[in-house]
């Protein structure tokens, strides 16, 4: 009987030891398994640059002007930008004194209307309805997709309500667009001269510039 209990005790101890070994191995395997898959994150950032571009194809020529009978033409500037706050369109003449000079004598000019000043009259600008002679321009309501200012350029495009100004000698803002995308701005020119204006071909250029809004 004693021998029986000795044998049983040995078997029990062996079983306990075996169980402990199995538990230990299982614990190691669990630990190994829990460490076999782990995660971490990486942060990806990129700054997309603001891009902006403007194209202003040449307008059609004024043609032949008879003094006292005004002529008009229109240039359309197309601006493309991804800047979420949009852009400003600015314009200037490229001649120091007047926009249009006689091609054979640069000292003979066509008078410009009073140069546009967007800051005049507490920001209302200084464009005025048409009268008399000279070269004037304005942003047109028709053909301008966004940003048209009736305060600056008149309530509509009719001659009674449309406001004109002369091209400035330095860049000045003529349109403010507040969103991204592709937009057109129609810029109208109107010209008349007095009867005493020297006959001949007059030429000149205006430059448009777009700048992304902050």
What is each model feature region?
Residues 1-38:
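Sec-dependent, cleavable N-terminal signal peptides
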């Amino acid at each position: 009987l004693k021998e029986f209990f000795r044998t049983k005790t040995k078997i029990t101890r062996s079983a306990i030891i075996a169980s402990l070994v199995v538990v230990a191995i299982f614990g190691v395997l669990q630990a190994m398994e829990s460490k076999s898959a782990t995660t971490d994150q990486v942060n990806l950032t990129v700054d997309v640059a603001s891009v902006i571009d403007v194209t202003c194809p040449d307008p059609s020529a004024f043609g032949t002007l008879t003094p006292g009978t005004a002529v008009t033409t229109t240039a359309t500037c197309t601006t493309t930008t991804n800047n979420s706050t949009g852009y400003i369109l600015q314009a200037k003449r490229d001649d120091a004194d007047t926009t249009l000079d006689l091609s054979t004598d640069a000292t003979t000019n066509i008078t410009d209307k009073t140069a546009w000043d967007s800051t005049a009259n507490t920001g209302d600008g200084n464009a005025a309805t048409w009268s008399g002679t000279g070269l004037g321009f304005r942003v047109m309501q028709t053909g301008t997709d966004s940003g048209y200012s009736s305060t600056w350029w008149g309530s509509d495009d009719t001659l009674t309500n449309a406001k004109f100004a002369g091209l400035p000698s330095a860049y000045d803002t003529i349109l403010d667009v507040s969103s991204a995308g592709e937009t057109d701005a129609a810029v109208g020119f109107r010209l008349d001269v007095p009867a005493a204006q020297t006959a001949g071909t007059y030429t000149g250029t205006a430059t448009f510039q777009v700048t992304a809004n902050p």
